[in-house]
Amino acid sequence: VITNGEEKIGGGGEKCFPTISIVDPDFMMTVPPHLTAYQGFDAFFHAAEGYLAKTANPMSDMFTLQAIALIGKSLAAAVKDGSNADARADVALANTLAGFVETLSSCSGEHAIEHALSAFHPKLPHGAGLIMISKAYWSRFKDTSADRLQAIAHALGRADGDFLAALAELQQACGVDKLRLSDYGVKPEDAGELADNAASTMGALFRVDPRTLSREEIMDIITESI
């Protein structure tokens, strides 16, 4: 166990890839509803961020929309009834596909911001933090990445292509739409330090955003989510 206070960074390498991996949804049946939602949204954002990022490519795109469609179809059902075998299988497959996307493309600045939040507030679950900042973060790219956001919305089943509305609907269906950073002690005056921490520890993720967010924008994303 490696512990660095107030720092949550990424890690990886060739040795992290298993020779074989067995993903068995039967082992997930007893995961509590709130953790099912949090981890399901983490998988969703792995896929969606990889699709948004400058590093997106034909290989990562092969898996993105299928992962998102499975989450849109079955995450809420898995949250409501953890013993729903079909829903659990869909979400497990979506999570696996989203992992392919994360590897072939990249996560984006959304993950960098959340890592800073969890570093300073260790009781904040990672997936919950992503949910909390998601609307503020994704709204920054509604003009620069309209086509890709529409494709994600369509994969979620939103016919009009309104990504932010589709995101809000999925969060509401999973019962996580009311989460706020203030629930975990984040204060507006913390925004500057959190933004600086995100940039210094996970700054590479901001560089794959469709456009570079300013320090002030990162601070605004945090304060809007409090």
Question: Which residues fall in each region the model found?
Answer:
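A glycine/threonine-rich phosphate-anchoring loop and its flanking beta-alpha core
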Residues: V1-P58
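Non-transmembrane, amphipathic alpha-helical segments
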Residues: T36, A56-S60, S83, D183, ...
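Short runs of predominantly hydrophobic/aromatic residues within well-ordered alpha helices
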Residues: A37-G40, R88, L130, A191, ...
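Active-site segments that bind and position negatively charged phosphate/pyrophosphate groups
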Residues: G50-A166
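C-terminal charged capping/lid subdomain of soluble metabolic enzymes
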Residues: A153, G157-I226
